[in-house]
Each structure stands twice: as C-alpha cells, then as structure tokens.
Amino acid sequence: MTSRASELSPGRSVTAGIIIVGDEILKGHTQDTNTFFLCRTLRSLGVQVCRVSVAPDEVATIAAEVTSFSNRFTHVLTAGGIGPTHDDVTFEAVAQAFGDELKPHPELEAATKALGGEGWEKLSLVPSSACLHYGTDPRTGHPFRFPLVSVRNVYLFPSIPELLRRVLEGMKGLFQNPAVQFHSKELYVAADEASIAPILAEAQAHFGRRLGLGSYPDWGSNYYQVKLTLDSRGRRIPGGNAWPNLTARLPQGSLVPYMPNAVEQASEAVYKLAESGSSLGKKVAGALQTIETALAQYSLTQLCVGFNGGKDCTALLHLFHAAVQRKLPDVPNPLQILYIRSISPFPELEQFLQDTIKRYNLQMLEAEGSMKQALGELQARHPQLEAVLMGTRRTDPYSCSLCPFSPTDPGWPAFMRINPLLDWTYRDIWDFLRQLFVPYCILYDRGYTSLGSRENTVRDPALKRLSPGGHPTYRPAYLLENEEEERNSRT
C-alpha cells in the first residue's frame, strides 16, 4: 500500500496528532512512555507532531478526539484501548467517529485464532472501512503475525510499549516524509536561565522562522543548568554570523561540552582516557587492568559492585560498566550491585540509587546492618557470589595495607575483595567523574564531600562561603582544595 506521506507534494508539511487512550494514564496508575517514543520517531521521519491528547476509556470522548485530529493532521496515531476486555473501546470509538459499523474481518479472525486461547475474538471486530498493514517485524525480518489497523488517516497502535515500538519500527514507510528532514543541535549552559533570557529572546528574533530556539532548565544536572535546543526544518542549523553571535553572547565559560550519553559511550570514553598517557589515564588503565583480571577469573553472576551512592563507588561502577561493555559485549546478564541500606538515608541518595539502577540496567542486591552482617546475608541469599568490587582507597580508614585482590579476614564471610581504586586520590575521583560527565549524587554539589546517613553527615565547613547578600552557601565537593578535609562531612 502506498503511504499517504509519499503522495504529498515535495516540501509540504506532514503533521501528526497522537491520542493516548487509557484511564490508567489519567489516574496515574501507569507512566506513559509511548508519547516520547512516538514523537521522537515521527520527527526522525520528517513528520511534525502538533498535538498530543490523553483520553479516557470512553467511546464518545475518543471518537470526538479522533474526528478533530483526523480533520487537522495528516496522520493520527492512537495508542491503547485495543484488547479483549470491556474497557478496550478504541475500535468502537473510531467506528463511531467515521460513521462505520464494527464488523468481523476475515484476516483478523484468522490471526486471533492463531493466538490461541479464548477471549481474543474482540480483536477481529474493526470498523468496516478498516485497512490492514502487516509490515516487517524488525526482530525477525518476517511480516507481523497481527496487522496494524488503520481507518482513513488514523492508525491504531497497541499500548504495550515494547510492542508499539516494534510495530512503528516495522511500519516506518507509512509515515516517512522524504521531502523534509529536521535538524537539531543541543547546547548545555552552566548559567541561570533568567540571566540568559534576554540573550535568547534577541537570538530568536534574529533567527526568525529559520530556527526554533528552546530553553529547558534542569535543576538535577551535575554539569549544566539550562539545555538549549535549536531546531530547523529542511535545512541544517543556519550558519553565518547568527550561530557564533549567540554562543559569543552567552556568559564566558558557561558553555559545557556535555555528553548526554555518558553511560552508553562509557567503553569508548574510558578506554580512550586509559590510553591517553596522562596521570589520570594511567590510574584508569591500572583500575581497568584489575577489573579485567576479575572478569577473567569470575563470571558476572559471581561478581557484584559494592554501591552506596558515593563518589568512589560511582566511579568504580562506571569503570566496571565500561570494561564489561568492552570485554563482554554479548553477555546478557545485568551487572549486580550490593547496597547496604543505612538507618536514615538521604532521600537524594535513594533517588540517585534508583536512577543509577535504570541508567546502568543493574540488579540490586540489598542488605542491612554492618558490613560483616551484610556480607553474611549476601552469602546466604546469593551463594553463587564469590567476589565484591569495592571503591576503597588507601586513604580510607583501615585500608592502607590492602591489595587489589584481598580475601576477607578470618571470621568474616568468605569473599574476594577487589579494589581497583586503591591508589586513586580524592582529586582523581572527581577528575574522572567530571571529565567523562558521569552522573553522581546531587548532594556533592551542595557541599557534602563524603556521604553516610543523615545522622552522621553534614556539609563540609571547608566549602562554606558567604553569598553577596551575606547568606551562607556551599561550593560543590569537586572544588575542595585540601583533600585531607574530605571526611569533614562525617561527624
């Protein structure tokens, strides 16, 4: 079937409206991730998404949205409300929107029978004017077993994110607009948004319709305060004096060469640093050698990283992740971390822990109590574990005599302690994290230099400063001048 987008005249805008269907979204029971994927993919296909709507599981409401969107946009994509249950009403709503009847479709009847089981018959009842699109499953290279249903310019996608993504990937030809290609550029600025607002307004007035300039503050980033996005349609980001003038007017030193994909690109960046020959690079190379030795001696199921959200174990986790990316790229096992929960953890640290688990795709092994108690619990619950990678440095208490591979002491649960960072300094840790734009706990940007629980951790007095108004403020931990004052945060 010829796609509607391919029939358009060259240069004509192709637009889309997205309707997300589901009471579970409106009630907060389920987090919608489909919108982000649909918008990003459609834009990559030259399609401008103009509106997103979330509708409840109500036939009349969905039908009204479909009618409105169908008249206004080239394509309408719905997600959700397709299934065997009473609240799956999208087919019925679309039929109502176009004055169609619901009728069983022979091909869908055959497809539902192939699914096996009972209760799937409802999926074969579609609007009488429906078209079926089989596409190619990107995972198998074969046509989808169950087709995508469309009615006029409305395409009815499933709500399951993994399935929706596969279907859209296999149906790109329905929406591809070769006449238009969107180009974008991102800038990261370490300056308050209000302070650069006049500069941005003047730049947008100068660019006019050639360029869309967006400004998005980020209060949770360790590296920038504002992300600027510059978008153009059908051409690359304009050159000439416009672009240099914008960057030149931003506060001096505020542009950050930020890498938003630091975790995905960890292997390339970490090994490049290790091979640089710099002082830090040599420390990285030594740590990687220890980690690679561990990977040669133990499987991933026998290893875990001791992780409490601190700066040292964050650097260690990134190194370990990079080494696994390089040495074991095809091993599906997630990396394991051991988290020993304190009695009163910082909420910010707990949030960072959850973000890190998602960011690195980790499996968390949780324990409580002292280190000795936690290792005993770990051994009892996960007997396959044999070694724990630790972010210990020689300057830590009771650590000056450790070796890269140190068995636990007699009387302790038997584990091999692997210490890749023994010879690293406080400055080495921060240089590594900051140079590679590794995300770390936001508390370090608020004056804490060493993290424990809320009961034994305070801001480091060495970082305290007075603001112009006379109020006390704290510089970030990476600006600590005397490394011997690192543990001033612990009481």
Curated annotation (Swiss-Prot):
Chief place of localization: cytoplasm
Q: Does the keyword Phosphoprotein apply?
A: yes
UniProt modified residues of type N6-acetyllysine: K282
The protein's Enzyme Commission number: 2.7.7.2
Q: Which residues carry this modification: N6-succinyllysine?
A: K282
In terms of InterPro entries, this protein maps to: FAD_synth_MoaB/Mog-bd, FLAD1_M, MoaB/Mog-like_dom_sf, MoaB/Mog_dom, PAPS_reduct_dom, Rossmann-like_a/b/a_fold
Name under which the protein is recorded:
FAD synthase
Q: Which organism is it from?
A: Pongo abelii
| Name of the gene encoding the protein in the UniProt record | FLAD1
